[in-house]
Curated annotation (Swiss-Prot):
A motif (OAR) lies at residues 279-292. Interacts with EFEMP2. Interacts (when unphosphorylated on Thr-90) with ELAVL1/HUR. Phosphorylated at Thr-90 by AKT2, but not AKT1. Phosphorylation impairs its association with a CCND1 mRNA-stabilizing complex, thus shortening the half-life of CCND1. A motif (Nuclear localization signal) lies at residues 285-289. Residues 81-90 have a biased composition (Basic residues). GO terms for biological process: anatomical structure morphogenesis; atrial cardiac muscle tissue morphogenesis; atrioventricular valve development; branching involved in blood vessel morphogenesis; camera-type eye development; cardiac neural crest cell migration involved in outflow tract morphogenesis; cell proliferation involved in outflow tract morphogenesis; deltoid tuberosity development. It comes from Homo sapiens. Belongs to the paired homeobox family. Bicoid subfamily. May play a role in myoblast differentiation. When unphosphorylated, associates with an ELAVL1-containing complex, which stabilizes cyclin mRNA and ensuring cell proliferation. Phosphorylation by AKT2 impairs this association, leading to CCND1 mRNA destabilization and progression towards differentiation. This is Pituitary homeobox 2.
């Protein structure tokens, strides 16, 4: 090899041997080359330099030079890459903004063809229009979130505050703290103020009289209900006077209380089964009942003449 030959020459020079010529044969690319080294100052310098700095292949030097040139180019380009390129801001005119806003109100997500038409109308590029719609949608979503947060913070919002009035304003005379301890007495209720009843000029305590039946009806029903129980111990004259009293009070009751249209049919006499074989026994029993209840049928006649609705009102449940 060439390096081995150079080492031998340098060793001979150091030992003081001065060879006339040294032949070194080495193979490279299937070729045999002959290298001659003569004893000259140039050869000695070259041998000494090759001892401390080994000789490199000429192809390697070219590769190193090309790599160094690339490194220098990269080092020169690094500062430019580190600097961030400044984007150019688009300044929209009032007409362009009006056109874009009108389109945004109609359609917040325009497609490619719509954006191209808007770009033609506004004299802008499609990319500028796309970026504007993207920013406008982000601003719209932010505003919607802020409005929802304000509604949640303020309850139902100012538009519902007028509909919901506090109870203290509606009933100023009613105390909510002591009502359970004092109880709902008639005196406490009479002193409280109720706007609903005051507007109608109605006393809350007198509402019971609006729905309660008249005293005459109740007394009439009581007297009529007590009659059958006391029939047996009362003579006939007293029963006749009581019957006359009922007859006198019934027309006055009908004239005082207006009776609505009765949905029930008038009462019909009950069906009585008559057996021809036992007619004699039935007639005897009927006569016996008539003698025992001497005035009872005349007392029940006024009640039987009433309709179904009047009978339901007169008779207690």
């Amino acid at each position: 090899m060439e390096t081995n030959c150079r080492k031998l020459v340098s060793a001979c020079v150091q030992l003081g041997v001065q060879p006339a010529a040294v032949e070194c044969l080495f193979s490279k690319d299937s070729e045999i080359k002959k290298v001659e080294f003569t004893d000259s100052p140039e050869s000695r310098k070259e041998a000494a330099s090759s001892k401390f700095f080994p000789r490199q292949h000429p192809g390697a030097n070219e590769k190193d030079k090309s790599q160094q040139g690339k490194n220098e180019d990269v080092g020169a380009e690094d500062p430019s890459k580190k600097k961030r390129q400044r984007r150019q801001r688009t300044h929209f005119t009032s007409q362009q903004l009006q056109e874009l806003e009108a389109t945004f109100q109609r359609n917040r997500y325009p497609d490619m063809s719509t954006r191209e038409e808007i770009a033609v109308w506004t004299n802008l590029t499609e990319a500028r229009v796309r970026v504007w719609f993207k920013n406008r949608r982000a601003k719209w979503r932010k505003r919607e979130r802020n409005q929802q947060a304000e509604l949640c913070k303020n309850g139902f919002g100012p538009q519902f505050n007028g509909l919901m009035q506090p109870y203290d304003d509606m009933y100023p005379g009613y105390s909510y703290n002591n009502w359970a301890a004092k109880g709902l007495t008639s005196a406490s209720l009479s002193t409280k103020s109720f706007p609903f009843f005051n507007s109608m000029n109605v006393n809350p305590l007198s509402s019971q009289s609006m729905f309660s039946p008249p005293n005459s009806i109740s007394s009439m029903s009581m007297s009529s209900s007590m009659v059958p129980s006391a029939v047996t111990g009362v003579p006939g004259s007293s029963l006749n006077s009581l019957n006359n009293l009922n007859n006198l009070s019934s027309p006055s009751l009908n004239s005082a209380v207006p009776t609505p249209a009765c949905p029930y049919a008038p009462p019909t006499p009950p069906y009585v089964y008559r057996d021809t074989c036992n007619s004699s026994l039935a007639s005897l029993r009927l006569k016996a009942k008539q003698h025992s209840s001497f005035g009872y049928a005349s007392v029940q006649n006024p009640a039987s003449n009433l309709s179904a609705c009047q009978y339901a009102v007169d008779r207690p449940v």
